[in-house]
């Protein structure tokens, strides 16, 4: 499914309809739902989405019916380059980068986005370094 972001509110939309990520009943009954896992009392719901022209798994977590958080996880080849990720977020969304940290790190590559009401935190972890960018609405 194609996911869009309202840059002024941080709300997510699918086909021009708001995607209520903080409502478990809406999430659990959504026709696009791909997976549901329950681990240690936490319910995780997974969706396959296209967001900022990249393929992501959108994961939404609830605890006892209360919204906890959501994040995007990607292994998309088009998102492997941190410059590409930054360009997509900054140029396509109108967000500006406030902070970038790069440090050596020995881990398998993964990247995830956390979105909370107009603020995106990007953590890209590769085999040789990790990048953290805090990106906020202009």
What is the predicted function of each stretch?
Residues 1-102, 120, 127-138:
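Short helix/turn-capping signatures at newly exposed starts of structured segments
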Residues 107-124:
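Low-complexity, intrinsically disordered Gly/Pro/Thr-rich segments
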